Amino acid sequence: PEPTPAPPPSLPAPAAGRTVNAIPVSGTVRIKRRGSRRYVTLRAGDQIPVGSTVDARNGRVTLETAGGGRADFFDGLFRIGQGRGARPLTTLTLTERLDCRRRAATSRRKPKRRRLWGSGSGRFRTAGRYSAATIRGTRWLVTDRCTSTTTRVAEGSVTVRDRVKRRTVIVRAPRSYTARRRR
């Protein structure tokens, strides 16, 4: 009989406000640790410090946080932030550059946008330019454009905080909510 391969070593538990566990699921996921200038490819699970930037535009990554949160993220570039306490809120801020100059907006090319898909449960929030979405065990997409941030819910529900109107709404699947900048 063939020997079975040993399971990968488990990662230590994430520390609230300090570290999260990042496990690549598919594709290429790159990490830029807080304080570093370069990205490195995430080959196996790793514990990364809060404040790091994750490039999951060409891959899918699972994040495990203190307090038992676990969710997959893909198709986006984001920075990880996290509070302290027994069940900290983990905030993923979209960081890909938006070119919002008038010349870029009127060009024939597709308008610039940044986005992030998420799927899972725990205390996660994805923050765009004009709104932030806090998950409630679901699958969702946040898309940032120069003039708006749209949260689309594919499964479950999401609490969206509109930073412009200063109001909070609950968005249930299959609906979406768009927060627009002031005119």
Task: State the predicted function of each range.
Residues 3-183:
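Flexible, surface-exposed loop/linker segments and immediately adjacent secondary-structure boundaries
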